[in-house]
Every structure is written in structure tokens, then in C-alpha cells.
Design a protein with these regions (language model features):
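A structural signal for the main folded, soluble domain(s) of proteins
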Residues: 6-7, 14, 97, 103-107, ...
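Conserved beta-sheet core of the metallophosphoesterase superfamily
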Residues: 132-202
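Active-site neighborhood of phospho(di)ester-bond hydrolases with catalytic His/Asp-centered motifs
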Residues: 19-24, 48-56, 81-85, 117-121, ...
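Non-catalytic terminal accessory segments
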Residues: 198-200, 207-271
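Cap/insert and terminal regions of metallo-dependent hydrolase folds
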Residues: 1-8, 180, 184-186, 220-233
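Conserved catalytic scaffold of divalent metal-dependent phosphoesterases
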Residues: 39, 53-143
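Core catalytic region of metal-dependent phosphoesterases/phosphodiesterases
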Residues: 1-88
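Short beta->alpha connector loops
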Residues: 32-33, 99-105, 158, 175-178
Length: 271
């Protein structure tokens, strides 16, 4: 983790540019104090850090509870500038607008005359960078609102990609570092926005990463009927993996009575 962070902070200092984070700075809203301290020590090296929260940065995916989170600690300490939803921020030659988790991307007001850049935390996908059964409405090709922005940067989908059509560039940032053995072939990267509006991916070097093999696991895996396993997982969906997460997603995606929503969020707060 430290190697990945140091590459990013070194790159920002070398190019004299700010760092903009498209959400999910942490993988859960209540990270241990040691992790908050580590991230703070990395980001404090930079003069300008802008960010929006992802769902994992927020208790119960609730934007109003941000102050209780590790992300909220960094905001209160002044280590990051939290971008308020829909509010333009002048960063260099561009006007950046943040759309945290739960906020829809809207058409920008172009009164400033500056090129507009969207920073959003929501799932977006393209062919080869998604999962079976992904909502077609979330495909980058269906996001017509993005044509109003010179560039758009997304968090949430851990499979990074750069999609360009005409003068519109869309970067899904992807995972910042490889965390699991099934990501061994994945290339983490960060996005660079150039003054002419073009976007390029800059790789995070992983040559020093080490994946530890478990010989005992190697013996067990061949004995598993993968066809049966995959079939069962497809039947159960993500519910079998993280039930509380699915409840929170249901709350996000459906209109519930305020008292019902509040009760469910209260019950799931320990998770």
C-alpha cells in the first residue's frame, strides 16, 4: 500500500498537480485508527487533495452520516477538500463538479466558460470490464449526460478502463492496488488530465508485489466442482456474499418510507 501511495504522491509533486479522489478512499466507513493515520500521513504531503465519498466511506451508505466516518475525520482535519455535490470547484484550467455516492450526475452550468469535469462515484462499465448481468443502463455508452463534460472520472467499479468518443473522455479509475490473488494480472493505474482535456492512464508499478501461495489450498481447489459452485453463486447472487451490503443497496435504489429507511440503517450500523 505504501509503495502505491508513494508513487502517486511523488507523481503529483513532480507534475505540481492536485490529487482528486473519486470515492471509496477506505474500504469501510470505520477504518482502524492506524489506517486513518497512515492515509493522513500520505496525503498531508500534498498541498491540494480533493475528494468525494463513495458508499464504503459512508455509514450505511448515508451521506448525512459522513461526519462519523474515517473519511469525515480527514475532511475535518483539513487533509482533504470534500467536494460538495453539484458545486463547481476551479482546479487549474478546469471546473470540477463532484457527485458523491447517491447523487445523480446533472448537466453543468457553463457560466464560467471553463471546460467541465465530472467526478462521480457510481458504477459504470464497458465490455470486458464488468460482471455477468450488469445493468445495461449503467453502460458508459448509455450515459448521454457525460457528453456535456470534457472529461469524467468514476469510482466504484474496480476494473479500470479509459473510454473515449470524440472529445469526451471517461476514465473509470479502477482499483488503486491489487488486493487478491485473482487480481494478479490486473494493472492498477491513476488518471492524468492534460490541459487540452485529454485523459491518459498512468500505471502504478507492481514489480515488487508478492502473492503468497498456499500449498494446502492448491490441493483443495481441484476437488471443487466449479460448475456447480458457479451455478449456485449465480442463483444466489451477491446476497450469499454480503447480505448487509445488499440491504444497503436496496435502500439506495428504492423509495422507502423515511421511518422504514431509518430503522433499517440503524439495525445495520454495526456492519
Amino acid at each position: 500500500m505504501e509503495r502505491s501511495f508513494s508513487q502517486v504522491t511523488s507523481l503529483c509533486r513532480k507534475l505540481d498537480v492536485p490529487l482528486v479522489i473519486a470515492g471509496d478512499l477506505f474500504d469501510k466507513w470505520n477504518p482502524p485508527p492506524q489506517l486513518i493515520e497512515f492515509v493522513a500521513a500520505q496525503l498531508i504531503q500534498l498541498e491540494r487533495v480533493y475528494a468525494i465519498p463513495g458508499q464504503h466511506d459512508l455509514p450505511n451508505h448515508n451521506y448525512e452520516l459522513m461526519h462519523k466516518s474515517g473519511y469525515g475525520v480527514l475532511r475535518t482535519a483539513g487533509i482533504i477538500t470534500d467536494m460538495h455535490p453539484g458545486v463547481p470547484y476551479k482546479i487549474g484550467d478546469f471546473s470540477f463538479i463532484g457527485f458523491p455516492w447517491g447523487y445523480e450526475i446533472t448537466k453543468p452550468h457553463k457560466g464560467s466558460g471553463m471546460p467541465m469535469v465530472a467526478i462521480a462515484h457510481r458504477y459504470i462499465w464497458t465490455e470486458g470490464h464488468t460482471y455477468v448481468g450488469a445493468d445495461p443502463r449503467l453502460s458508459v455508452t448509455q450515459s448521454s449526460i457525460l457528453k456535456h463534460y470534457t472529461a469524467s472520472f468514476f469510482g466504484d467499479n474496480h476494473k479500470g478502463f479509459l473510454w473515449i468518443r470524440g472529445k469526451c473522455s471517461v476514465l473509470n479509475c479502477g482499483g488503486f492496488m491489487r488486493r487478491k490473488s485473482d487480481e494478479k494480472s490486473y494493472q492498477p493505474s491513476v488518471g492524468l488530465l492534460y490541459t487540452d482535456g485529454t485523459v491518459k492512464r498512468h500505471p502504478i508499478l507492481t514489480t515488487e508485489d508478492v502473492f503468497h501461495r498456499n500449498p494446502e489450498l492448491d490441493k483443495i481447489v481441484p476437488e471443487i466442482d466449479m460448475d456447480e459452485f458457479i451455478s449456485e453463486m449465480n442463483r444466489l447472487g451477491d446476497v450469499a456474499i454480503n447480505f448487509p451490503e445488499q440491504i444497503l443497496r436496496y435502500i439506495d435504489e428504492h423509495s422507502l418510507e423515511p421511518n422504514v429507511k431509518e430503522a433499517l440503517q440503524h439495525l445495520l450500523l454495526p456492519f
